[in-house]
């Protein structure tokens, strides 16, 4: 069916006392992203013309964290219930648009479920998302007559008979803007909590003869809210299990789906293999036949075809061309770039550095602010000394250079094509093509030397 224009209200004013945190509840993260951001993203994908965020506690921190100038920030200075929160947003509703109500602490709600709810909304009525629970204790119950929804009664206000009802309110609903404003104006706080319940509009709509269409989500977990860290951790595992399942069904080999975390967006080629305890953050692309070893963290990086990242390596804001090998225990920091066939071994760190085709840095090396050509060998213990205490400087190493172990390159410095740097050398001046450079303290031999004896 053809949908009306729609705006979304996200309720995010609660303090989250049971989180025992100074951070507003909705800013606690799920899959590396604030809970409320998941909800904002769903609203955006659904095509919301405007997203109204009702906030209260920690408003400044919310604004600083979300940094979204498209949001309409609506202050709820006193938290007097969900109906009161919607009343604060009501002046921004257009009469001819639909208003979808969501919650900042219900992060797993899917676009597909919301679209079905939107499609099911009757003309002049309400679309209401409900679920059936084996144990509905604590939730508002859906009351019906002859199968039709007539209202919602909160648990504290329910009779013993009503508490036997298993269908409960999720709090998510959609209604026309003009209708919603009229119903909101009629709300009272005559209940056990002394609050203004948005749920009371269901009875008001029924009294006007309006239809209330109940829709169920694809999964009950979509409507699970978060009140404490235990609930958040459970939703995290549900989310991660869903992401792992999608990857497995798309052809990615996860060696242990229960020990894989996706905290962003992952694009994979064919025959990708990911071992246990791998974390993917931000936007990551893995080419064909990429292998990621156990315990690796990959963040905002592009990994080319046939690359292999050995266990316990960290790759952040890096770009690897085809057939590169990394680790184990390697660290690629922002700006690291490896051309085809390059190798970075154990305990090697790169930052703002390019390693050319077929070049190798096998062990115990720091390469920072460096441009390294093709077919270069970087010996163990090599350091680019890029910082003088105030400024950073660049090291340039041309093609076919051999750098011996325990070399220090004091930037700014350039090493010419085909040069050889002997082990233990400190390079402080530019090196010409094909030169041999060495700087060593003369070796001293003392015959018959005796080690000191400890005094008694």
UniProtKB/Swiss-Prot annotation:
Active site: 363
EC number in record: 2.7.7.23, 2.3.1.157
Cofactor binding annotation: Binds 1 Mg(2+) ion per subunit.
Annotated region described as Linker, given as residue ranges: 230-250
InterPro entries in the record: Bifunctional_GlmU, GlmU-like, GlmU_C_LbH, Hexapep, Hexapep_transf_CS, MobA-like_NTP_Trfase, Nucleotide-diphossugar_trans, Trimer_LpxA-like_sf
Enzyme class name: transferase
Chain residues that bind UDP-N-acetyl-alpha-D-glucosamine: 11-14, 25, 76, 81-82, 103-105, 140, 154, 169, 227, 333, 351, 366, 377
GO biological process, one term: UDP-N-acetylglucosamine biosynthetic process
UniProt-annotated stretches for the region N-acetyltransferase: 251-456
GO terms for MF: glucosamine-1-phosphate N-acetyltransferase activity; magnesium ion binding; UDP-N-acetylglucosamine diphosphorylase activity
Named cofactor requirement(s): Mg(2+)
Keywords tagged on the record: Acyltransferase, Cell shape, Cell wall biogenesis/degradation, Cytoplasm, Magnesium, Metal-binding, Multifunctional enzyme, Nucleotidyltransferase, Peptidoglycan synthesis, Repeat, Transferase
Family in the record: In the N-terminal section; belongs to the N-acetylglucosamine-1-phosphate uridyltransferase family. In the C-terminal section; belongs to the transferase hexapeptide repeat family.
Function, in words: Catalyzes the last two sequential reactions in the de novo biosynthetic pathway for UDP-N-acetylglucosamine (UDP-GlcNAc). The C-terminal domain catalyzes the transfer of acetyl group from acetyl coenzyme A to glucosamine-1-phosphate (GlcN-1-P) to produce N-acetylglucosamine-1-phosphate (GlcNAc-1-P), which is converted into UDP-GlcNAc by the transfer of uridine 5-monophosphate (from uridine 5-triphosphate), a reaction catalyzed by the N-terminal domain.
PANTHER family reported for this sequence: BIFUNCTIONAL PROTEIN GLMU, NUCLEOTIDYL TRANSFERASE
Subunit-structure text: Homotrimer.
Stated name of the protein: Bifunctional protein GlmU
Organism: Salmonella paratyphi A (strain AKU_12601)
Name of the gene: glmU
């Amino acid at each position: 069916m053809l949908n009306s224009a729609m705006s979304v209200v996200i309720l995010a004013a609660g303090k989250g006392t049971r989180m025992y945190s100074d951070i507003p509840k909705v800013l606690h993260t799920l899959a590396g992203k604030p809970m409320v951001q998941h909800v904002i993203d769903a609203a955006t994908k659904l095509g919301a013309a405007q997203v109204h965020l009702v906030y209260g506690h920690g408003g400044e921190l919310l604004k600083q964290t979300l940094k979204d100038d498209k949001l309409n920030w609506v202050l709820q200075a006193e938290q007097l219930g969900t109906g009161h929160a919607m009343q604060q947003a009501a002046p921004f509703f257009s009469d001819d648009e639909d208003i979808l109500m969501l919650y900042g602490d219900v992060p797993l709600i899917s676009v597909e479920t919301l679209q079905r709810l939107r499609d099911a909304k009757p003309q002049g009525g309400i679309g209401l998302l409900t679920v059936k629970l084996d144990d509905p204790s604590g939730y508002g119950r859906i009351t019906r007559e002859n199968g039709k929804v007539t209202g919602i009664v909160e648990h504290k206000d329910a009779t013993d008979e009503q508490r036997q009802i298993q269908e409960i309110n999720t709090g998510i609903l959609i209604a026309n803007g003009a209708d919603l404003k009229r119903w909101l104006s009629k709300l009272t706080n005559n209940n056990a909590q002394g609050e203004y319940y948005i749920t009371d509009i269901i009875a008001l709509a029924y009294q006007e003869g309006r239809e209330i269409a109940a829709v169920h989500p694809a999964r009950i977990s979509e409507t699970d809210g978060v009140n404490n860290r235990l609930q958040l951790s459970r939703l995290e595992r549900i989310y991660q299990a869903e992401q792992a399942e999608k990857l497995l069904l798309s052809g990615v080999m996860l060696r242990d789906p229960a020990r894989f975390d996706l905290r962003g967006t992952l694009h994979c080629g064919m025959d990708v293999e990911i071992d246990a305890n791998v974390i993917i953050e931000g936007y990551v692309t893995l080419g064909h036949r990429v292998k990621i070893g156990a315990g690796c963290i990959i963040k905002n990086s592009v990994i080319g075809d046939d690359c292999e990242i050995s266990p316990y390596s960290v790759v952040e804001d890096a770009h690897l061309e085809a057939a590169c090998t990394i680790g184990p225990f390697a660290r690629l920091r922002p700006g690291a770039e490896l051309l085809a066939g390059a190798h970075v071994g154990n305990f090697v760190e790169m930052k703002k550095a390019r390693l050319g085709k077929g070049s190798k840095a096998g062990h115990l090396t720091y390469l920072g602010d460096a441009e390294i050509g093709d077919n270069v060998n970087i010996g163990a213990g090599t350091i680019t000394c890029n910082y003088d205490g105030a400024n950073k400087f660049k090291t340039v190493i041309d093609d076919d250079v051999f750098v011996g172990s325990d070399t220090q390159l004091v930037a700014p410095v350039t090493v010419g094509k085909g040069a050889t740097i002997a082990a233990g050398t400190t390079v402080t001046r530019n090196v010409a093509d094909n030169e041999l450079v060495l700087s060593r303290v003369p070796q001293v031999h003392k015959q018959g030397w005796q080690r000191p004896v400890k005094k008694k």
